[in-house]
Amino acid sequence: MEEKVVDRRVRKTKRQLRLALMKLMAEKSVKDISVRELAAIADINRGTFYIHYKDVYDLLSSLEDVLADGLVVVCRRHNAKDSEGKTYPYLMELYQYIEQNADLCHVLLGKNGDIAFTDRICHILRDEFLYDFLAYYYPNDPAMLDYFCSFIVSGNMSLALTWIDGGMKQTAEEMAVLAGEIIMHGVKVLETKA
């Protein structure tokens, strides 16, 4: 029984620290955040912080792993061969995941996030679903496939961040449809919206 209480306290402390880091990263770069500042916002002492994390970067890494691992799960649920050439189910789940983790995405992938982490996310999106999907349905030119994958992944990252920064007025479903239309029809999407 006592162990559950400790586990709950540990979870609560870690949650407070994650929220404190997200709050601070919304305002400034992680390199400008001190353990003292984090502990004050999380309402814990510095010693408690060091029980759980080596430093601010260790805490940041744990947050990044949570987001990245969740994206891997989303991507792996969608097999290119079983998708019948349709990206909507994948995009739908991807944008739902982004919606559910909007604060985390905003902080980790936004202006104060780490570019290396953004690259990691791009590689996950590319390598865990998109490349196989495009190679299976459009196998003609591997070099063009690489360019197209890079374009789609970067575009979707930017689209998601623009959506988050704009207050997420559209639903995840609407964003998935928009992303799919842009991927499949490019600039023609603007012609139909005008």
Region locations from a protein language model:
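Basic, helix-initiating cap at the start of DNA-binding domains
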Residues: 1-28
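Residues in the helix-turn-helix
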Residues: 16, 48, 104
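Basic, amphipathic alpha-helical hairpins
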Residues: 23-30, 74, 78, 101, ...
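Helix-turn-helix
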Residues: 24-57
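Short, basic, alpha-helical segments at the C-terminal edge of helix-turn-helix-like DNA-binding modules
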Residues: 34-35, 63-72
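Hydrophobic alpha-helical connector segments
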Residues: 75-103
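Amphipathic alpha-helical packing segments from all-alpha helical-bundle domains
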Residues: 112-138, 146-150, 154, 158, ...
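C-terminal peripheral helix-coil segments that are non-catalytic and often amphipathic
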Residues: 134, 154, 162-194
